[in-house]
């Protein structure tokens, strides 16, 4: 009888220890999830910034990588990539370097095409069109004979100018992940076509699918902040061997080169 009571007591203590350990792990995971969301919210709070010149006065995260007196450079990049069945993959986007020291901005509009040759080797070609930004307008710095392309560049809007994540905390069933070895972290959400940002993308791009996208927010580097790390947004509408349709966006603050 005494042996039986001791056995029951031992089993009770083991179960209690397992329960406490599980609660501790769950609490730690919840704390990490919260930290990841807070980290992303700092970047997402930049959306929208309708006037790109506002970045001249926006301060980003600074660390020992910055030299004394360097105010830093914002790097803004928006790109749409489309590959439909039987056609080459094409990406069109613009990257802008906003130098807070000189209060000048330069960048490139980039058109890239990818395909496989008859032997199955990947091939690509890329064209870059240099631009500058003045008075919140994108201006090509070299003549462009193609009027349609020139207007596309001049009318280009970055996602940060119209995207809005004020409802990010209402997104449900997010898949939060963290890899301490890199370190890297991400949050993935299934969006609907009624989502504000999805509507904005469809308004500006000819997206050849009615499928609603998944939103992936990802970053790397120290969760507390790092000028070495990067943060990116990716709206993936379709992703398979035959078709790929996705939009990527990033805003990063770096030491001026």
Curated annotation (Swiss-Prot):
It is a lipid-anchor. Gene3D superfamilies: 2.50.20.40. Coiled coil: none annotated. One of its GO terms (cellular component) is plasma membrane. Its main location: membrane. A lipid is attached at residue 23 (S-diacylglycerol cysteine). It comes from the Bacteria. Residues 1-22 form the signal peptide. Keywords: Cell membrane, Lipoprotein, Membrane, Palmitate, Signal. It holds the Pfam family DUF576. It is found in: Cell membrane. A lipid is attached at residue 23 (N-palmitoyl cysteine). Belongs to the staphylococcal tandem lipoprotein family. This is Uncharacterized lipoprotein SAOUHSC_02789. It comes from Staphylococcus aureus (strain NCTC 8325 / PS 47).
């Amino acid at each position: 009888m005494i042996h039986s009571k001791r056995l029951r007591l031992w089993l009770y203590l083991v179960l209690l220890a397992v329960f406490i350990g599980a609660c501790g792990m769950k609490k730690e995971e919840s704390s990490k999830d919260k930290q990841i969301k807070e980290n992303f919210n700092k970047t997402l709070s930049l959306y929208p910034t309708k006037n790109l010149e506002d970045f001249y006065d926006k301060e980003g995260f600074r660390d020992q990588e910055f030299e004394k007196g360097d105010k830093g450079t914002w790097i803004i990049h928006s790109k749409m990539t489309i590959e439909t069945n039987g056609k080459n993959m094409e990406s069109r986007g613009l990257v802008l370097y906003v130098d807070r020291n000189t209060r000048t901005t330069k960048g490139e509009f980039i058109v890239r095409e990818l395909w496989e040759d008859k032997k199955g080797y990947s091939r690509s070609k890329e064209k870059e069109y240099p631009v500058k930004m003045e008075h919140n307008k994108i201006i090509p710095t070299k003549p462009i004979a193609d009027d349609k392309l020139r207007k596309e560049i001049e009318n280009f809007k970055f996602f940060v100018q119209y995207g809005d994540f004020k409802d990010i905390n209402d997104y449900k069933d997010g898949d939060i992940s963290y890899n301490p070895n890199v370190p890297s972290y991400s949050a993935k959400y299934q969006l609907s076509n009624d989502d504000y940002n999805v509507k904005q993308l469809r308004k500006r791009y000819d997206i050849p699918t009615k499928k609603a996208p998944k939103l992936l927010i990802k970053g790397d580097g120290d969760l507390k902040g790092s000028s070495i790390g990067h943060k990116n947004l990716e709206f993936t509408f379709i992703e398979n061997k035959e078709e790929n349709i996705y939009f990527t966006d990033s805003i990063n603050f770096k030491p001026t080169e």
